[in-house]
Every structure is written in C-alpha cells, then in structure tokens.
Regions:
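Alpha-helical secondary-structure segments
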Residues: 41, 117-124, 152-158, 200-201, ...
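A structural "hinge/loop" feature
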Residues: 46-62, 84-87, 113-114, 166-175, ...
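N-terminal secretory signal peptides
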Residues: 1-10, 20
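N-terminal lobe/hinge region of extracytoplasmic solute-binding protein
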Residues: 43-95, 126, 195-199
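Ligand-site clamp/hinge motif
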Residues: 218-264, 389
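Detector for C-terminal structural segments
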Residues: 21-22, 40, 208-212, 217, ...
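Surface-exposed binding/hinge segments that line
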Residues: 92, 137-183, 206
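Aromatic- and charge-enriched surface segment that lines or borders ligand/interaction sites
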Residues: 90-134, 156, 242-245, 293
Length: 519
C-alpha cells in the first residue's frame, strides 16, 4: 500500500479549516519547478477532502482523482472541447442506447489488486448510478440501464434512453474513473482519502492536510506519461495570497483573482505568462426558502429587487467580469440575456411591507476570499438600503462546503449564501444541482419544483438545439420565480504561469494536471 503522510480528519463534515493555508504557505521550503524540470508546483483553492469519484466534493479533487484513478476518457487540453482515451483502447457509441468499450491491456491497480478489468468498469459506473448509494453524481449516469461485461477487457454500456450530455459531461469527468471493485468492497463500499488501488498516470504519494499533496508518476503506467515526475499541490484559499506566492517564486502556476487580471496583464511579473479564459462557472446569491425567516416568497422577491447586481460585480471584480443572467454560460443552449426581476429598491420595500417583515435580520455566508467579501459588502449595503440588516459570516473552505448539507446541523439556519459552482460544457450540468433530489446535497436553497425536474429530464434526451435552448431558459425562469436566486456573474478565468511551463488547460481554463509539461 502507498504510504501517505496523513494527519487529521478525513471526512468533509469535520474538515473545518481544511485548506486554510493563507500566508503561512510560503514558510514551506520552496518546491517550485526544479532546475531539471522534474517538479511542478501549483496552487489549489481548497485542500482535498474526498478521493472517491462517486462522492467527490470540489473541482480541485477532480484533477487529483483522474490523475490517480484512470478514467475511461479525459478532456483534451486546448481551446476546443474534445476528449481523448486514457484507460480505454477504444470506445464508441454504437447507437443511441449502446456504448462499446475495450480497456487497454496491462493497466494495474496498486497494492496487489491486480489488473483493471471490465468488471471494475461495471462496478465503478453502476455504483454511481445506484440510488441506494446516494452519490451526488448519480445524475451523470441517470440514463444507465446496466454495464454488460463481454470479456476481461471489453463490455457494453447500455442506456435506458438517449442521454445527450454523455460525451460532454459524464464520460470526460471523474464519473468515468475506474476503481477496483475488490478494493472498494474491502473498504466497505466507499472511501474518503484512502489511496488504495491507484491506477492512473500518477500516484498520490504524500498528503499533509492544509499544506500539500504530492503526485508522483506511476512507474507501472505503460502509456502516455504525465509531463512532470512530481506535482506538488498547495492548498491556498485566497487568490491574492497565491499571487504573492507566485511572485515570490513558490508557485509555477496559479489561478488568479479575476479582479487582479487588469493589473497582471498590464504589468506581468518577469518570466511569467498571464492567461484569461472564458468561464462556464456561475456565481449567485442563494436564499434558503425553507428557513423560517425566508419562507414568504415576497421576502425573497424583495431581496432579489434589493440587489444592484451590476454594482456587486463591478466592485468585486474591478470591471473584469460581466453581469450574468443565470446558471448557463453564454454560448450554451439556455444562456439568457436578462433575468425576470430587476433592481428596484422601492419595489423591495413595498414587498417587505406587504409581508410584514419590518426589521428583518439575515446572515450571509461566504467563502473567506477577498472577492467574495467585497461582493458581500455591497449586498449588505443594498439590503440595508431597504431596511434589512445583514451579518456577513466568513468561512474557510472546509466549513463552507458543508453549510447546506443535510448531514450537518446548520442547513436550516443557513439564510443567504454566496456561492460559485464550476461547470461542464452542457447546460444540464448546471441545472442538475437544483433538482429536488439535490435538496440538502448541493441544492442549498432547498428549491423543490416538480416542473423544473420534468424540464431537466426532458433536456437530457432532447437533441434539437432550439428546443434545448427553450427548456433551459424556462428552468431558469422558474428559479427566478422562486425568489431564491440572485444571479451575479460567470466571471472569467485568470491564471498565471512561469514561461518555463506549458500548462494543460481545458477551454475554460480549468487545469488538467497530467497535461502540464515543461515548455
């Protein structure tokens, strides 16, 4: 078994403080790209919490998971959305309901768990799809009927119905990562940070919570190797702190604050390259409709009308990001030009008076990041202008990502929350998190709408672009009507890297660690 330096809690419910790295990050010995180009050091905005592909928590974990548990396919680095095979020798859609695959021969699991087989593929996919397992990502395989094993290396994925996002948001994500059936069953059917039976281009060889994660090339991987012998991942929550670390020479690559892009592009640090990429992500103010103080839709609609979205976005991002109008980014079916509510403080005051909500007090939970705090302060001022007192509560990432979970004890006390979700290049990957099944999982607004669910399911099988556009616009209109959402921005993605590094990035700027190479 791979030895991991792993001190401290492993479940996300007790990781209050994971990733709270701050300026202390740079007290570590410098491990940025070595003179011989063997070690790459990058920043992650949160520490890892769960390595199980079926129960992963955040985007940074995705990159680690697909590096250590070989997926069937992965996205291709570059400016076009496409994919390439990793664990499979071949994979093709035979018809609307059938996908045939054959694994590469000789992919082994560590710790004596033997060769990867089609039986492991069947187990890995079906455990995500099985409702009994309550995977947050069951929607990725909602159309699955079964995986049929043909022989040791080949099989068929059978679908119950056509599933349009399969090649965009299911197969090229950790939803196609293959774990060892034997190993996972021995661990009780799921795992958190255990690194048993790894199989990918890299192995996770060291994890010091809140400090670093080390990936090392898998010596038994016989196919395309990762670009660096080692990748050191430092969890640094605040992008401004990461930018200082980059300028100090402690990092080879980091995402930047969106608000820093104008400054960095105008005056980049010596030996660096500054990147700006279009973003699929979305940022919004969520309102918990089951909270006792916010159950009246008139109060929630008042909050919508109280928020000056343009001022919030301009203040938080220094003019570097545009106002967004939903959860679906420009360029995708369902992208909207406007929301169905507007900034109207007088209307907000009238709705509050009608609801008898004089002297309303609310809390606003945010991640402890400078951009989030600036946005929250503008929201706080907007609410004060209509007579609502708002207390801002800052959280580190380990705490923040548990706030709305039904497994915790805070979800009914949650009132307002400023959130950002990453995205895949299909609108269904935005809408899925707000279905009734996601209430208390990722649907922290506790928005429960049967029409919304029916439209989401319709969008998964509809291939006509115009009809999909109508469906996803209608879904976002229902979110507007609930009063539980104030959509703010899709941001842009800013990054900076040393000119000695050729980063592997998706078209939206998200990293593909195994595709980073020396320049």
């Amino acid at each position: 078994m791979t030895t991991i330096d792993k001190h401290g809690p492993t479940r996300r419910s007790v990781l209050a403080g994971a990733g709270a790295f701050g300026a202390a990050a740079f007290a570590l010995p410098r491990t940025a790209i070595s003179a011989d180009g063997k070690i790459l050091t990058v920043r992650s905005y949160s520490d890892l919490q769960v390595l199980d592909p079926a129960f992963r928590v955040s985007l940074p974990e995705d990159d680690i998971i697909r590096s250590i548990f070989a997926p069937m396919v992965v996205p291709i680095a570059g400016d076009v959305w496409d994919w390439k095979p990793i664990a499979v020798e071949s994979i093709e859609q035979v018809d609307d309901l059938t996908i045939a695959f054959k694994l590469r021969d000789g992919i082994g699991f560590t710790d004596g768990f033997g060769q990867m087989t089609a039986e492991d593929v069947k187990f890995s996919i079906e455990r995500i799809a099985d409702p009994a397992n309550e995977s947050p990502y069951a929607g990725d395989w909602s159309a699955l009927k079964e995986v049929e094993v043909k022989d040791t290396l080949s099989g068929l994925i059978h679908l119950k119905n056509k599933f349009v996002p399969l090649w965009a948001t299911t197969l090229p994500t950790p939803a196609s990562c293959i774990v060892s059936k034997k190993a996972v069953e021995e661990m009780g059917g799921k795992f958190t940070t255990e690194t048993v039976a790894q199989s990918g281009q890299y192995l996770l060889t060291e994890w010091v919570p809140k400090q670093k994660t080390v990936l090392t090339r898998n010596p038994d991987w016989k196919h395309e190797p990762g670009g660096f012998e080692e990748i050191h991942i430092l969890p640094i929550e605040d992008p401004a702190t990461a930018e200082l670390g980059f300028e100090a020479g402690d990092l080879d690559y980091t995402w930047t604050a969106v608000s820093s892009l104008p400054r960095l592009k105008e005056n980049p640090p010596a030996g660096s390259v500054v990147l700006e990429k279009p973003s699929l992500a979305y940022v919004w103010l969520g309102i918990n409709q089951d909270n006792e103080a916010l159950k009246d839709v008139r109060i929630r609609r008042a909050i919508q009308h109280a928020i000056d979205r343009e001022t919030v976005v301009d203040a938080a991002y220094f003019g570097a990001a545009a106002v967004g109008n939903g959860i679906v980014a420009p360029g995708l079916p369902g992208a909207r030009d406007a929301v169905t509510y507007d900034y109207d403080p007088d209307k907000a005051r009238a709705l509050l008076a009608e609801a008898g909500a004089d002297g309303l007090f609310v809390t606003l939970d945010i991640l402890n990041q400078s951009e989030r705090l600036t946005a929250a302060q503008v929201i706080q001022a907007n609410l004060a202008d209509v007579g609502i007192t708002c207390e801002i509560k800052q959280n580190d990432s380990g705490t923040f990502w548990t706030l709305g979970s039904k497994d915790g004890d805070y979800f009914m006390n949650l009132q307002l929350v400023l959130s950002r979700f990453s995205m895949q290049p299909d609108p269904s990957w935005a809408t899925v998190w707000f279905t009734p099944e996601q209430v208390g999982v990722w649907n922290w607004e506790r928005f429960d709408n049967a029409e919304y669910k029916a439209l989401h399911e319709q969008g998964l099988v509809e291939s006509d672009p115009a009809e999909r556009d109508r469906i996803y616009k209608a879904m976002q209109a229902l979110m507007d009507e609930s009063g539980s959402y104030v959509f703010l921005t899709h941001e842009v993605v800013g990054a900076i890297h040393k000119d000695t590094v050729a980063p592997g990035l998706k078209p939206n700027g998200e990293s593909l660690l195994a595709d980073f190479k020396p320049a």
